[in-house]
Every structure is written in structure tokens, then in C-alpha cells.
Amino acid sequence: MLMPKRVKRRKQFRGSMAGKAMRGNTISHGEYGIVAMESAWIKSNQIEAARIAMTRYIKRGGKVWIKIFPDKPVTTKPAETRMGSGKGSLEYWVAVVKPGRVMFEIAGVAEETAREALRLATHKLPVKCKIVSRADLEGGAGSEN
């Protein structure tokens, strides 16, 4: 699972997911990618499941880039616990994703293979996604999943 090696503070506020992604909204490494269409917290195990789905489909060929990193800690209190007595313990790590964010990229395989691998990965993620190519993002609209 992905998680930071060390953090300045163990527990964080929830924060806001308003607005669009200003950074990470272009395909920088690969030829095809998955773009988020809505805001969400994506857990580290969901990122890992999507990565495994892609790499198993493309087998030995190609390269996959993960463009998001779970750097936000999420805490929970035990079930049937009274309110108060401090913030809960750290449960898992999430990556905050906003609309327009490129989450995964893939290169080195045929277009049909890349699109199918990315389609399998989108089923592992809790957001609506769009599969795009480098030409789609430079030119205009992408293909809908």
C-alpha cells in the first residue's frame, strides 16, 4: 500500500474538495490516461487494485505511471463509542482527487490494449472516469468510458 514515509502531523482536518484540478491535468509520461470526472477520496488499496488490474492485463509489455499519491490520513473512532475524548486513530490513507485530474497513465502498448487495461482499472475506482489519449487532452474532448 502507498503511504508517506514520514509526516509532519499525524492527524489532519478533512478539508474541502471544491473546484477543479489545477495541477496534474495533463498526460506527461504516457500516451493514454484516466481522468477523474468528479471529486473523491481514493484509498491506497483502491489505487493498488487499479494498478494490479492494469498490469495483469498488459502482462509484460508497456509501462504504467500512478499520478496520485495517498498523503491524507483518515481517522475513525471505534463503533459504539461516546462523543468526545479526542480524535480517533488513523485508519487509512487517501488521495484527494478533483475533476480533471489524470490519475493513471500507460504507454508502450497498442491502443486497444491500453484502453481495455484502463477500462478495467476504472472499475476499481470510486469516481466516474474518462479514458483519454495525449492527443485528446491537447486537442479537446476525450472519449467517454
From Swiss-Prot:
The keyword RNA-binding applies. One of its GO terms (biological process) is translation. It holds the Pfam family Ribosomal_L16. Keywords: Ribonucleoprotein, Ribosomal protein, RNA-binding, rRNA-binding, tRNA-binding. The keyword Glycoprotein does not apply. GO terms for molecular function: rRNA binding; structural constituent of ribosome; tRNA binding. One of its GO terms (cellular component) is cytosolic large ribosomal subunit. Binds 23S rRNA and is also seen to make contacts with the A and possibly P site tRNAs. Part of the 50S ribosomal subunit. NCBIfam families: rplP_bact. Belongs to the universal ribosomal protein uL16 family. This is Large ribosomal subunit protein uL16. It comes from Lachnoclostridium phytofermentans (strain ATCC 700394 / DSM 18823 / ISDg). The lineage of its organism: Bacteria, Bacillati, Bacillota, Clostridia, Lachnospirales.
